[in-house]
Design a protein with these regions (language model features):
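Transmembrane alpha-helices and adjacent helix-loop boundaries
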Residues: 2-187
Length: 187
């Protein structure tokens, strides 16, 4: 029963991280982003593919974040200049495109069969019985760090500008700030 509860907690903590990102996009910036899961998939597959090639897990996780950010930047540059409705459509299309590529390109991801043999985090350091517990504790720490980071971002000058963009984009433009630039950074 304990292993089951830890597995459920791991899933909850992963979804909490996704919710923090959506909170920053929609709650503070006012961006309707349906592509969030596409960025998550890019990061997950990047980490998995690099780990399978023997890259250490922490390095592959950092590369995953970098690849997801690299995918978000050009998408944001294009879609955010059009308007919020177009952002929703473009990010939905992006997310669906990522899903289709991951499912059909068997040479890269093995398609619907998935990627077997991905090295587990903490596999060499902890006993098989406690690996999931360590993953859960790491995710708790990452969630706490992400929550603190979002809190600091929102209280910063950047955070005040993105909230102003959400509330009145015309006023932000009148004050000499480029709303598209701040939306892209938020994405």
């Amino acid at each position: 029963m304990e292993a089951y509860l830890i597995a459920i907690a791991i899933g909850i903590l992963i979804y909490m991280l996704l919710a923090f990102g959506l909170s920053l996009h929609y709650g503070f910036t006012g961006l309707i982003n349906f592509g969030h899961v596409g960025f998550f998939a890019i990061g997950a597959y990047t980490s998995a593919l690099l780990s399978l090639k023997g890259v250490p897990v922490p390095v592959s996780m950092a590369a995953a974040a970098a690849f997801a950010a690299l995918a978000a930047y050009p998408l944001g540059m294009i879609a955010l200049r059009l308007g919020s409705d177009y952002l929703a459509i473009v990010t939905l299309g992006f997310s669906e495109s990522v899903r289709m590529v991951l499912q059909t390109e068997e040479w890269l991801t093995r398609g619907m069969h998935g990627l077997p043999g991905i090295p587990r985090l903490f596999a060499g350091w902890a006993s098989p019985q406690t690996v999931d517990l360590w993953i859960m504790l790491l995710l708790l720490a990452v969630n706490a760090g992400a929550l603190l980071l979002i809190h600091l971002v929102i209280r910063s000058p950047f955070g005040r500008v993105i909230e102003a963009v959400r509330d009145n984009e015309v006023a932000v433009r009148a004050l000499g700030k480029d709303p598209a630039k701040f939306k892209t950074r938020s994405l």
